[in-house]
Amino acid sequence: GIEFVTGTEIANGKNNQNPAVAKGDEMAAYLMDAKVKNVKAEKLLEEYDAVVLACGASNPRDIKVTGRDAKGIYFAVDFLKTTTRSLLNSKFADGKYVSAKGKKVLVIGGGDTGNDCVGTSIRQGAVAVTQLEMMPKLPETRAANNPWPEWPRVLKTDYGQQEAIAKFGHDPRIYETTVKEIVKNKDGQVCAAKCVKLAWEKDPETGRMNMKEIPDSEYTIECDLILIAAGFLGTQKYVADAFGVKLNARTNVETAPGAHKTNVDKVYTCGDMHRGQSLVVWAIREGRDAAKEVDTFLNGYSND
């Protein structure tokens, strides 16, 4: 049969109450905030004929600026995860989530995760939402160097931005901008972010685009909640270490091209942990492909 172990984290002992920051080779299984059991990775390999690691790629990229230690700064994944968990567990009655109600929110990052932060902040009751994007604003229609059937590099206004436009009357995104410093009040709480405009220039030798700060373009954005959605750096390393699986240069679990088997016998991987942060449709595809590979490993063939 197949057994799904959800919410799995690495813990360093039975009494560990915060497995998300622990290290070691003990596995702690959690379901809806309830501790189920502790078991070593080696024990799982002894008990099961195959183990599929599908732990995501949630290691967030941080920002290295003065004032980063201020209160009121969260990674996007923590903000979104606590919101969803509190909603499902208690419809927010437990209060175990980061709330944007009444806050001026600054979202750092213009991708899908940043969009989710914008939409969630608005639904929680934020009084202002600003989203920073380092890249230039894309055109609304295809450029001459982006013909069909290439993927259209055009401006996309997702649900979060659409809700912001409907509520505040303007697009929350500010392009070609980054944070230089975070300002704290006397209590150590974030109260503003000092930003600077960016310019992108093409290197004549390499052809690569490089960004540089525009002199005298600094300005300040008032905010009391900052959500960092600056991308992800691959999977959490402690899971891979527990099973002894190798990571590639992108810190995703390494496999042969088009395969899901790791360097460890009986251990497979799929989803974001395998290919890096992506959309749920890819996670579904990866899960199906990994299941077929495991089926073939166990039975010698697969019926799809």
Describe each region flagged by the PLM.
Residues G1, V118-E181, Y301-D304:
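Rossmann-like dinucleotide-binding cores of NAD(P)H-dependent redox enzymes
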Residues G1-V65, K180-K194, A199-K202, L225, ...:
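Feature captures the FAD/FMN-dependent oxidoreductase FAD-binding
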Residues E3-V5, Y74, I174, Y268:
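General small-molecule cofactor/ligand-binding pocket signal
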Residues G7, K101-K104, E176, V264:
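Phosphate-coordination loops involved in phosphoryl transfer and adenosine-cofactor binding
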Residues K71-G102, E201-Q277:
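FAD-site-proximal beta/loop scaffold in flavoenzymes
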Residues N89-A126:
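Rossmann-like NAD(P)H-binding beta-loop-alpha module
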Residues G110, E133-K137, K184, D272:
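Cofactor-binding loop segments of dinucleotide-utilizing enzymes, especially the Rossmann-like FAD-
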Residues N115-C117, M273-L298:
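A conserved FAD-binding loop/helix module that cradles the flavin
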